[in-house]
C-alpha cells in the first residue's frame, strides 16, 4: 500500500540495487509487456556511477514479468566487447542530430541490449560524458539527444524490426529528452522518468534548440526552458507520465527550495498530480559476506573471524598500525557533495579519540591532495588510495568498523547498504536515502546538522559503542540483517508499470519553478 509523507505521494518502499547476478523464471512471452529501458550507463559495459549499477540490475529483475530491452549509446568500449552484434535497422537524423543504426546484442544471461550506433558521436576515448582530459564533451547535447530521439522513434515503432515497447523508462538527464521527443512525435506510449541526481540537469544554450530539432513549444517555461537555458532534466520532468526518485526522502526533499535545484516548483505540481514517488535503491545478491570471492575470508553474524582477517588485510595494505582502535572508512568520490571536507575537518579529533582512517576513491584535486596530506601527517593512523579498486573496496567494507558518509545530499546511496551487509556501521547525515536505510542507534548513526560538530558527535557516539563489544556486535547483527535485495523488492516498479500501462493519457506539463 502506498502512503503519503509531507504531502508527497510515495509508493511502498523498495530496496533496489544494481548488479547483474539476478535471474528468474520468466512468464510466457505473450503475457509480458515490452519495456524499453533507456540509459547512458550499463555496468556490464560502462559505468561512471550508480546509474550503471541500477541499469544493470533493474531490467534483469523486471524480466520475470516483462520483456525488457535496454537502449544504450554505442560507445567504443561497448562495441569492443560485442562480438555478436546484429543490426536491426536505421533511423534518420534530425536537424544537427546525425542518423544512426540500431544494433542488438544478447548478453550471456539473456538480457537484450539495443545500441545506438553513431560513430561520429560515440566512438571516442574517454567516459560517456567527458574526454580523457576530464572535460565535458562540447557536443553532449547532440550525443544524448541522439539517444533520446532513437528511443522515441523506437517507441513509435521504427528502427527495431517491429519491436515496439508498451512503456519507456528513461533515467537521469542523458535520456530525459526521451519523453519530450515522444510527446512531440505524437507517440502516446506511457513514459516513466527516474531522477538519480537532480543536481545534474543537462543544461545547454537556447541556441541549441535548432540543432536539436525542437519545436517552438520546447522553448517555453512549461517545457524545457530553464532561466534562459534549456534543461534536458526539466524536459523529462515536464513530459513524462510519472517521475520516480531513488529514495522516499529524496522525493520529499526535491520539492523544497533547499534541495530542488530550481525545479521544486514543477516537482510540487507533480506531487499534486500524484506523479512523483520514491523507490529506494538497494543491493545485489553478490553482497554476501559468507561467500564473496573478493574477501580475504568470509564471515557471518555468528562467526566474526573472517571479518578480523579482512581488517588485517586493510591494515597491511594501507600501512596502518594493527589493532589500534576503531577503523573508520571512506569509500567515496572525493567531492563536496559527499562531505569530504567535513571528514577532513574532524579528522584530528577522530584520531585523537583513538580512531584510524582508511580512504579509497578519487575526485576533486584539492580534496585528493588534502586526504594525501592527512595520511602523510599521520602515518600508521591514516591510509589513503586515490583511485578505485573493487576488491579493495569490498575488503574495506568487510574490515572496517564504521563507514563515514557525511553527505550534504544523497539521493539514495549504496555504500551504506554495502557496509551494513558487511557489518560496518554507517555514520551518515540524515538526508535522502541515508535517512531511509539507516536506523539511528540500531543499524548505524545519523546526524542532522550540516556541521562538523554534529558530525563529530555522531563519530564519538560510535567510538563509545566500539568500546562496548556486546552492543557493537548487536548493532552489527541488526545492520547485516537490514538490507534487502532486488529480488525481494522489485514489486513497487511492477505495480507502477502496470498502472502506467493501463493509463496512456498524454503527459502532464509542469509550470515554471
Curated annotation (Swiss-Prot):
InterPro entries: Glyco_trans_1, GS/SS, Starch_synth_cat_dom
GO molecular function: alpha-1,4-glucan glucosyltransferase (ADP-glucose donor) activity; alpha-1,4-glucan glucosyltransferase (UDP-glucose donor) activity
Metabolic or biological pathway, per its Swiss-Prot or TrEMBL entry: Glycan biosynthesis; glycogen biosynthesis
Binding site for ADP-alpha-D-glucose: 47
Domain of life, source organism: Bacteria
Catalytic activity from the UniProt record: [(1->4)-alpha-D-glucosyl](n) + ADP-alpha-D-glucose = [(1->4)-alpha-D-glucosyl](n+1) + ADP + H(+)
Broadest EC class assigned to this enzyme: transferase
Pfam families on file: Glyco_transf_5 (PF08323), Glycos_transf_1 (PF00534)
Gene Ontology BP annotations: glycogen biosynthetic process
Keyword presence, Glycosyltransferase: yes
EC number: 2.4.1.21
Keywords linked to the UniProt accession: Glycogen biosynthesis, Glycosyltransferase, Transferase
Cross-referenced HAMAP family: Glycogen_synth (MF_00484)
Reported function: Synthesizes alpha-1,4-glucan chains using ADP-glucose.
Family designation: Belongs to the glycosyltransferase 1 family. Bacterial/plant glycogen synthase subfamily.
NCBIfam families on file: glgA, PRK00654.1-2, PRK00654.1-5
Protein name, as recorded: Glycogen synthase
Amino acid at each position: 500500500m502506498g502512503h503519503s509523507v509531507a504531502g508527497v505521494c510515495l509508493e511502498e518502499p523498495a530496496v533496489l540495487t544494481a548488479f547483474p547476478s539476478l535471474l528468474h523464471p520468466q512468464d510466457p512471452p505473450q503475457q509480458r509487456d515490452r519495456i524499453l529501458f533507456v540509459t547512458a550507463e550499463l555496468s556490464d559495459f560502462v559505468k561512471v556511477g550508480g546509474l550503471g549499477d541500477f541499469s544493470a540490475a533493474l531490467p534483469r529483475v523486471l524480466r520475470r514479468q516483462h520483456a525488457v530491452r535496454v537502449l544504450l549509446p554505442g560507445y567504443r568500449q561497448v562495441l569492443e566487447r560485442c562480438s555478436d552484434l546484429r543490426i536491426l535497422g536505421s533511423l534518420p537524423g534530425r536537424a544537427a542530430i546525425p542518423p544512426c543504426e540500431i544494433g542488438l546484442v544478447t548478453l550471456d544471461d539473456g538480457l537484450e541490449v539495443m545500441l545506438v550506433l553513431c560513430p561520429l558521436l560515440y566512438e571516442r576515448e574517454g567516459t560517456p560524458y567527458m574526454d580523457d582530459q576530464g572535460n565535458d564533451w562540447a557536443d553532449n547535447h547532440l550525443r544524448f539527444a541522439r539517444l533520446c530521439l532513437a528511443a522515441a522513434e523506437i517507441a513509435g515503432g521504427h528502427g527495431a524490426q517491429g519491436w515496439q515497447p508498451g512503456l519507456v523508462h528513461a533515467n537521469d538527464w542523458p535520456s530525459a529528452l526521451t519523453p519530450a521527443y515522444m510527446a512531440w512525435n505524437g507517440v502516446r506510449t506511457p513514459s516513466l522518468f527516474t531522477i538519480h541526481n537532480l543536481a545534474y540537469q543537462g543544461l545547454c544554450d537556447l541556441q541549441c534548440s535548432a540543432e536539436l530539432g525542437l519545436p517552438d513549444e520546447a522553448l517555453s517555461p512549461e517545457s524545457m526552458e530553464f532561466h534562459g537555458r534549456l534543461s534536458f532534466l526539466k524536459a523529462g520532468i515536464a513530459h513524462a507520465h510519472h517521475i520516480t526518485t531513488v529514495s522516499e526522502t529524496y522525493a520529499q526533499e526535491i520539492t523544497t527550495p533547499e534541495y530542488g535545484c530550481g525545479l521544486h516548483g514543477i516537482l510540487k505540481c507533480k506531487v499534486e498530480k500524484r506523479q512523483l514517488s520514491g523507490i529506494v535503491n538497494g543491493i545485489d545478491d553478490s553482497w554476501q559476506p559468507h561467500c564473496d570471492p573478493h574477501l580475504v575470508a568470509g564471515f557471518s553474524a555468528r562467526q566474526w573471524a573472517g571479518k578480523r582477517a579482512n581488517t588485517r588485510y586493510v591494515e597491511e595494505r594501507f600501512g596502518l598500525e594493527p589493532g589500534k582502535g576503531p577503523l573508520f572508512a571512506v569509500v567515496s568520490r572525493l567531492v563536496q557533495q559527499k562531505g569530504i571536507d567535513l571528514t577532513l575537518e574532524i579528522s584530528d579529533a577522530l584520531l585523537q579519540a583513538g580512531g584510524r582512517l582508511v580512504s579509497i576513491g578519487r575526485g576533486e584535486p584539492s580534496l585528493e591532495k588534502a586526504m594525501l596530506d592527512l595520511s602523510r601527517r599521520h602515518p600508521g593512523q591514516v591510509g589513503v588510495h586515490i583511485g578505485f579498486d573493487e576488491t579493495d573496496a569490498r575488503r574495506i567494507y568487510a574490515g572496517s568498523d564504521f563507514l563515514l558518509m557525511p553527505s550534504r545530499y544523497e539521493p539514495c546511496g549504496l555504500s551504506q547498504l554495502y557496509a551494513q551487509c558487511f557489518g560496518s556501521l554507517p555514520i551518515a547525515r540524515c538526508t535522502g536515502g541515508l535517512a531511509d536505510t539507516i536506523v539511528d542507534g540500531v543499524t548505524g548513526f545519523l546526524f542532522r546538522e550540516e556541521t562538523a560538530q554534529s558530525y563529530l558527535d555522531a563519530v564519538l557516539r560510535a567510538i563509545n559503542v566500539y568500546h562496548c563489544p556486546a552492543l557493537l556486535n548487536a548493532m552489527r547483527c541488526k545492520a547485516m540483517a537490514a538490507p534487502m535485495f532486488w529480488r525481494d523488492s522489485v514489486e513497487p516498479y511492477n505495480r507502477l508499470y502496470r498502472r502506467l500501462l493501463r493509463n496512456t493519457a498524454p503527459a502532464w506539463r509542469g509550470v515554471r519553478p
